[in-house]
Amino acid sequence: MNVQVSPDSLVIAGKTYGSRLLTGTGKFKDLEETRLATEAAGAQIVTVAIRRTNIGQNPGEPNLLDVLPPERFTILPNTAGCYTAEDAVRTCRLARELLDGHNLTKLEVLGDQKSLYPDVVQTLKAAEQLVKDGFEVMVYTSDDPILAKRLEEIGCAAVMPLAAPIGSGLGIQNKYNLLQIIEDAKVPIIVDAGVGTASDAAIAMELGCDGVLMNTAIAGARHPVLMASAMRKAVEAGREAFLAGRIPRKRYASASSPIDGLIG
């Protein structure tokens, strides 16, 4: 039986995407593995750490855009490694120059090197400035529903709460906060950080997240390209399960076969 599923696209800053899996480009062994994993993931949006990855600022060095060309992928520059609003804003402006006026950016302002938790005060400050400067801001933040709403009200194009600390692989630690963020949001909510395996991605999507962004879960796997393929399927399955609607949880059994018309 061929079940027809209605078109279900992710829309960010007015642009439509068929894939809800966003991937990072760091930690792979080389650019070829980056390309293969990105293609296996089916990702259309790929995020790039401007302070760590060459996209043209270092002529003569391998350029990520040679394997992930902007004609095929939406390049999402990020401010990884920034610890102040000023550094983050400066990095975004550099990225816009390198990408010929590209305004979509991923903002992250970190609090310290141990936890890599977001510094929410600096994040709010940077988000306000970037929105004023005409950027379409996708913002990495904590799983605080009040803060998520504030970032939406500032004008961020997407809010990206963490599932767990960056690179930890712990999976979603607070489903209830995520649910509240999702229920209150009028912009896409994309889980960012902490995903460890395919089931984590599926759970995020089943909760109603609009997408999942990951890097370490794929790049750090024993077989990154295979894991990328698994993550693609998990995100798709989780989204379909969310749209289908899970059955209610009950304390007691409920027979799956009707009792009417029993013989004997």
UniProtKB/Swiss-Prot annotation:
Main location: cytoplasm
Top EC class, one word: transferase
Molecular-function GO terms, alphabetical: thiazole synthase activity
Keywords from the named record: Cytoplasm, Schiff base, Thiamine biosynthesis, Transferase
Alphabetical list of InterPro entries matching this protein: Aldolase_TIM (IPR013785), Thiazole_synthase_ThiG (IPR033983), ThiG (IPR008867)
One Pfam family this sequence matches: ThiG
Matching CDD domains: ThiG (cd04728)
EC number annotated for this UniProt entry: 2.8.1.10
Pathway(s) where this gene product acts: Cofactor biosynthesis; thiamine diphosphate biosynthesis
Residue positions binding 1-deoxy-D-xylulose 5-phosphate: G167, A193, G194, N215, T216
GO annotation terms (biological process): thiamine diphosphate biosynthetic process
Compartments reported by the entry: Cytoplasm
Listed GO CC annotations: cytoplasm
Catalysed conversion reaction: [ThiS sulfur-carrier protein]-C-terminal-Gly-aminoethanethioate + 2-iminoacetate + 1-deoxy-D-xylulose 5-phosphate = [ThiS sulfur-carrier protein]-C-terminal Gly-Gly + 2-[(2R,5Z)-2-carboxy-4-methylthiazol-5(2H)-ylidene]ethyl phosphate + 2 H2O + H(+)
Residues at the active site: K106
Subunit composition and interactions: Homotetramer. Forms heterodimers with either ThiH or ThiS.
Function per UniProt: Catalyzes the rearrangement of 1-deoxy-D-xylulose 5-phosphate (DXP) to produce the thiazole phosphate moiety of thiamine. Sulfur is provided by the thiocarboxylate moiety of the carrier protein ThiS. In vitro, sulfur can be provided by H(2)S.
Annotated family: Belongs to the ThiG family.
Descriptive protein name: Thiazole synthase
Native source organism of the sequence: Stenotrophomonas maltophilia (strain R551-3)
